[in-house]
């Protein structure tokens, strides 16, 4: 397995991004043959991810004061904003309507793969038990809004909202935090999970045991580029790692200082340095 150098990754990290409108233990990591990895949300994660692009417009998720939500479609040609429903007489306020989302989560996001829409509900960790105040969930829907599958993440798991969702070979890839309460103490584990679009099965794929946080920021070929946090001398240290999902190799690319940031744009990964310079 040829390792990619720091320079190679930072200069030529290719990813296909969804537009705004628009060591370690492994489970099942050796039978994957990926060569078309790409991002399906922005590298900044799920925050304010209310739109998903489409060839003729964009999908939008809008939440009401009741807590429930609907999917709308903004048509660029007709300049119309309509509920994603063929039932013109519907009030769009119950689960019989394909645009309706029943949710008690603390945040909703929407994204699109090649074949499906996904509604993502962001959970909130409880403070006193091994459950969530709100569960994280994933809804797989037809592009017309109809429900295909709906699953809740395990009760002690939340999406890492600062990381992107990636897709390839009919699977979604996303990072999670798994927490466990022991008396008054709490411990955390960090996993990469997959969701199979064909079978609807959610599976643990890779456990990050050498870092204390991991979030996807870019994807290309067989590689997921991760921004991670290490503990160095008891202090957190941000760094960039790569995970080869075909070989399960997880290797470090570089450290980041407190003043250095990464930004994904136009199929490249950019580094903003402390002297305010930007390098690809």
Task: Describe the function of each predicted region.
Residues 26-42, 67-94, 129-155, 183-208, ...:
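Surface-exposed loop/turn elements that mediate protein-protein interactions on large endomembrane-trafficking
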Residues 9-18:
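Gram-negative bacterial Sec-dependent N-terminal signal peptides
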Residues 113, 122-126:
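Active-site-adjacent structural elements in enzyme catalytic domains
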Residues 59-61, 118-121, 173-176, 225-228, ...:
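Residue position within the beta-strands of beta-propeller blades
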Residues 2-10:
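Bacterial N-terminal signal peptides that target proteins for export
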């Amino acid at each position: 397995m040829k390792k990619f150098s720091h320079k190679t990754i930072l200069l030529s990290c290719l990813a296909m991004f969804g537009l705004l409108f628009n060591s370690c233990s492994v489970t099942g990591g050796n039978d994957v043959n990926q060569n078309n990895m790409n991002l399906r949300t922005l590298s900044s994660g799920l925050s304010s991810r209310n739109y998903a692009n489409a060839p003729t417009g964009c999908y939008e998720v809008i939440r009401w004061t009741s807590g429930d939500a609907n999917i709308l479609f903004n048509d660029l040609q007709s300049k119309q904003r309509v509920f994603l429903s063929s039932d013109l007489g519907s009030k769009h306020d119950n689960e019989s309507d394909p645009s309706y989302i029943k949710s008690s989560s603390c945040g909703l996001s929407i994204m699109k793969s090649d074949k499906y829409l996904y509604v993502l509900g962001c959970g909130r960790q409880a403070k006193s038990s091994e459950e969530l105040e709100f569960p994280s969930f994933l809804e797989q829907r037809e592009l017309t809004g109809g429900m295909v599958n709906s699953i809740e993440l395990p009760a002690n798991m939340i999406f890492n909202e600062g990381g992107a969702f990636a897709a390839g070979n009919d699977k979604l890839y996303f990072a999670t935090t798994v927490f466990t309460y022991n008396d008054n103490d709490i411990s955390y584990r960090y996993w990469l999970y997959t969701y199979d679009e064909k079978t609807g099965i959610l599976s643990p794929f890779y456990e990050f045991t050498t870092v204390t946080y991991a979030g996807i920021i870019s994807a290309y070929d067989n590689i997921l580029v991760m921004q991670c946090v290490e503990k160095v001398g008891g202090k957190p240290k941000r760094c960039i790692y790569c995970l080869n999902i075909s070989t399960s190799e997880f290797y470090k690319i570089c450290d980041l200082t407190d003043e250095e940031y990464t930004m994904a744009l136009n199929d490249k990964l950019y580094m903003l340095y402390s002297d305010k310079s930007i390098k690809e």
